[in-house]
Amino acid sequence: MIDFSLYLITDRNQTGGRPLLEVVEAALSGGVRAVQLREKDLTPAELYDLAWEMRALTSRYDARLLINERIDIALAVEADGVHLGVNSLPVTAARRIAPDLLIGYSSHSVGEAVAALAKGADFVTFGPVFPTPSKAAYGEPVGLGELERACRQAVGDLVFGLGGIKRDNLAQVTAAGCYRVALISDILAAPDPAEAAGAFRRGLGC
């Protein structure tokens, strides 16, 4: 069961020099209820240590923790789930290894989204919806029209819009029929992450 609508993805390079855990805690205090730990430049040992700290923090706020790609670390720290992508372990293999973990999947087309859910993913992120530096490698944004199509053709309630989503364009996302979003910078880089998280929750009606 996906019991969150605002999905925060970490990037400690976007916190303006503030400690990542401090910024994430502020976001949690503002209402974030799911965090994906995504720090790809860390060694496995460093990521493991940070994951334990993030697990303790999210547990205090009764929030979900998912680990990007590393199902071994997700299991080791008793995270709630793992987030996979096209170059990760296949969804079907992850489900065999960890039948009780939440599995998220990064999709960049309607076909990818539908296929991932059919293979056992619990939810998908879909994008990039708008231009964003963090998703430049995936080419041009898919746009709001494709997001709307993804929500119609996949199970709409299991699709999180991703990529360049900010408080000032959130209404366009919900108008496309998407009431779940994943994001990085508009919370992590905000002067007040708690206030930013609260604004997103209000905009999503959650």
Task: State what each model feature region is.
Residues D72, G145, A182:
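Active-site phosphate/pyrophosphate-handling residues
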